[in-house]
């Protein structure tokens, strides 16, 4: 499809945002937009500069015939500090304190903007590491794990306290619960994670 440059820039930006940590070849873009590589390279340079300036992330270029571009979501240090400070203020509310020294967080973990900030901060810290999956124990960690996995473009895996028959065979470990001081069990479906995976 032949698009005006402004339309092409918008579409290209969306494709990069939708496919983080994924190599997209220049040929893909030239074919898609019916444009010369030189024009696509100029477009990418504009997007790269804007992403870095606005704290959206960075665009890495991979040279060679099989090369292309990779969008890596990354939060600016000042943006991360501001988000962390705002979260700290919300968590310091005395009404959040629960018996046993716990803090009520469910409402914060239900807010998309909080998850967005937390997910991007965590993903930024691991953007140069080889991560195959993000793992969490059900259920409180699920929203954050899913957001981080989205930014890293990897699967997220849930470890459960009780296995479901629909998950097939599982691997399990016993641990001492911090909240109840009882020995409990964590179970993971063997099909959800390949042997030797790098897990966050």
Predicted features and spans:
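PRPP-associated nucleotide enzymes
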Residues: 2-200
């Amino acid at each position: 499809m032949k698009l005006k440059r402004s339309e092409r820039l918008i579409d290209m930006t969306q494709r990069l945002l939708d496919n983080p940590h994924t190599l997209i070849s220049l040929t893909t873009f030239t074919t898609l937009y019916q444009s010369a590589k030189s024009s696509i390279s100029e477009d990418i340079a504009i997007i790269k500069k804007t992403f870095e300036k606005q704290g959206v992330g960075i665009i890495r270029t991979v040279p060679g015939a099989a090369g292309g571009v990779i969008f890596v979501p990354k939060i600016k240090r000042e943006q991360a500090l501001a988000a962390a400070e705002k979260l700290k203020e919300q968590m310091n509310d005395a009404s959040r304190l629960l018996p046993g020294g716990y803090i009520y967080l469910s409402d914060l973990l239900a807010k998309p903007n909080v998850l967005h900030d937390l997910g991007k901060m965590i993903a930024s810290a691991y953007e140069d590491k080889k991560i195959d999956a993000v793992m969490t124990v059900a259920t409180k960690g699920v929203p954050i794990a899913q957001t981080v996995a989205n930014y890293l473009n990897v699967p997220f895996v849930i470890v459960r306290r009780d296995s479901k028959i629909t998950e097939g065979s599982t691997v399990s470990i016993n641990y001492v619960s911090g909240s109840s001081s009882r020995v409990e069990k964590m179970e993971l479906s063997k099909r959800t994670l390949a042997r030797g995976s790098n897990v966050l």
